[in-house]
Regions:
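Hinge/cleft segment of the Venus flytrap/periplasmic-binding protein
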Residues: 44, 48-123
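Structured segments of extracytoplasmic/periplasmic soluble domains
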Residues: 4-5, 25, 29, 48-56, ...
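A generic structural signal for alpha->beta connector loops
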Residues: 10-11, 30, 89, 151-155
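Short, solvent-exposed loop/turn elements at domain surfaces
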Residues: 23, 98-104, 134-139
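Extracytoplasmic "Venus flytrap"
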Residues: 123-144, 148-151, 156-179, 183-192
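Hydrophobic alpha-helical
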Residues: 1-24, 46, 145, 182, ...
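Short beta-strand elements at the ligand-binding edges of bilobed clamshell
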Residues: 28-39
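Structural detector of well-ordered beta-strand residues that form the stable sheet scaffold
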Residues: 12-14, 34-35, 93
Length: 201
């Protein structure tokens, strides 16, 4: 309703997530949106796992090129040493560059090269997304993960939660021993024990 009014009155509308509808609206005279660089987010999620499984430096394929030539430039991510965390950096989507964001599930070209299976054998990963009904997570983030898992030789089992209860997710982690790695996206950030208790069995 607000978007219709703002369009009729020539008032720019600003959004977040750079979902396809928000990007498409820019071509119709809306203001702009912000991309969370989901392509880089998804890559970092699985790249950190791949590096741990390979026993290589954590920065491999991120700030330092890997053996396939995958590397990120410093303007799309940041590493915070005190948090031991990588973050993708937001980017403004405007009338000048919106065409680059019309498909939010395209992998980031600088990190789109296939890893060699002999040097990086397939590993099995359990990965959950806390809310399968979330538009950004289900229509952008997970499709990107599914493209990168092939490039990184990861056999990922995806578990979608209900966004409400941890047990909806943990009940589907019945045999942790069959996986090589885990990527856990908690419903509540103080519920880590729900997962570590299962992994310690």
């Amino acid at each position: 309703m607000f978007n219709a009014w703002s369009k009729d009155n020539g008032v720019p509308t600003f959004g977040y997530d750079a979902n396809s509808d928000a990007v498409a609206a820019i071509a119709e005279g809306y203001g702009g949106t912000i991309s969370q660089h989901a392509d880089v987010q998804a890559y970092l999620t699985l790249r950190v796992l791949r590096n741990a499984l390979d026993g290589v430096d954590v920065d491999t394929g991120i700030g330092t090129a890997d053996d396939a030539g995958n590397v990120l430039s410093s303007d799309v991510y940041v590493y915070k040493e005190d948090e031991r965390s990588y973050y993708s950096l937001n980017v403004a989507v405007t009338a000048d560059n919106y065409k680059d964001f019309t498909d939010s599930t395209v992998v980031w070209e600088p990190v789109s090269k296939q890893l060699d299976a002999s040097a990086h054998p397939t590993k099995k990963v359990w990965l959950n997304i806390y809310n399968a009904s979330d538009n950004f997570l289900s229509s952008t983030y997970q499709p990107l993960l599914q493209k990168y898992d092939d490039l990184l030789n990861l056999d990922v089992e995806y578990i979608g939660g209900d966004g409400q209860t941890e047990s909806n997710i943990t009940n589907r982690l019945g045999n942790p021993g069959q996986y090589d790695a885990f990527a856990i996206n908690m419903v509540k950030t103080d519920n880590a024990a729900s997962y570590t208790a299962l992994l310690n069995q």
